[in-house]
Amino acid sequence: MYSLEISLRYSPFPLSIQKKEYEDIKRIYDEIKDSMNSDNQNSPLIELSCEKVQDKLITVLAKEVISVQIYEKSAVAGGSKRPGFSLDI
């Protein structure tokens, strides 16, 4: 299972989705990255769906995305910390 995590401007918590195939998550990553690079004033909406939680849908404005990352979600349970964008309270 692969996770895509997005950080939004003025939001302390990331949004994430999961996909089973790396190619699927990489395609979404590239789409978001291309939207971030464009100088289009009418920022497109990016709609994301999750394979782990079937009814989970997220729509964000591309211009509000400040970072995006992909990581493989390990099947190993335990106290390991997930990579990037974690908030330690």
Curated annotation (Swiss-Prot):
Domain of life: Bacteria
InterPro entries reported in the protein's UniProt record: UPF0367
NCBIfam families cross-referenced by the UniProt entry: PRK13683.1
Family: Belongs to the UPF0367 family.
Name of this protein: UPF0367 protein PMM0124
Organism taxonomic ancestry: Bacteria, Bacillati, Cyanobacteriota, Cyanophyceae, Synechococcales
